[in-house]
């Protein structure tokens, strides 16, 4: 907690040239797990006071006076994400910070020059449209992006959110484009090393389903036929989608980083895209 910002802030302070980069950070919402997050602002909410306090703290840690993008890490209300299906026990609106208050607070940060824009994350179609509606009603700054998972094993964003991205000009910042590393191809071989993330984080069970592994083998064959790595196939597909405005890559080595970056120069052929869609039609969203 906070260390990533501290590391980047230390690097920025030594390097300078702040205007040469696009810098983003997030404010956490309330935890729905068993670990709790009361240590974050005494219980993380999206109230005006907490948004201002969290942003000021991030700016201090990052050694900068503005953020290019400030995101709500996940909704304050209860929603489905990380593989959860079925939605029961909706929160009472009286127990939640009004989205209008959240929108107004973020607009205040924009007007103060502390952030240049703000975005949403792990959001639903209802949540995105409600944020945009509140902005339109009040004339406040609107959200510019949604950071949600999107990859060959989880194309659920296409069901309701892709149209919103295109029609409302609120682009997808696609995270987990390699599906927790599954689409890197590394986890095709057994046994898994105990330090590999898929073994360490057992709570992310949606990535260890038989259908997911079956789909990976099919996509690996498509990549081989196209003469590229499985990771490059997966990343190039995400980048090619018209509603995607940023593909959030990750790497644990310089070799992986080079492989991922090279995917930006790959254009998938019509035959390759057809093969991808044929697999998706048979094994749809095995890791939602």
Task: Show the residue positions of the predicted features.
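Short, acidic/polar
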Residues: 47-61, 99, 103, 128-132
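Beta/alpha (TIM)-barrel catalytic core signal, keyed to glycine-rich beta->alpha loops juxtaposed to Asp/Glu
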Residues: 75-278
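Active-site groove signature of glycoside hydrolases
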Residues: 60-83
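Active-site mouth loops of central-metabolism enzymes
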Residues: 37-52, 89-97
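Short acidic capping loops at alpha-helix termini that bridge into adjacent secondary structure
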Residues: 18-21, 25, 65-69, 116-117, ...
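N-terminal binding-site loop/beta-alpha segment at the start of enzyme catalytic domains
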Residues: 1-27, 65, 111
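Structural motif corresponding to the early beta-alpha repeats
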Residues: 22-44, 73
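Glycine-rich, aromatic-flanked loop segments that form ligand/cofactor-binding clefts
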Residues: 16-28, 170-176, 181
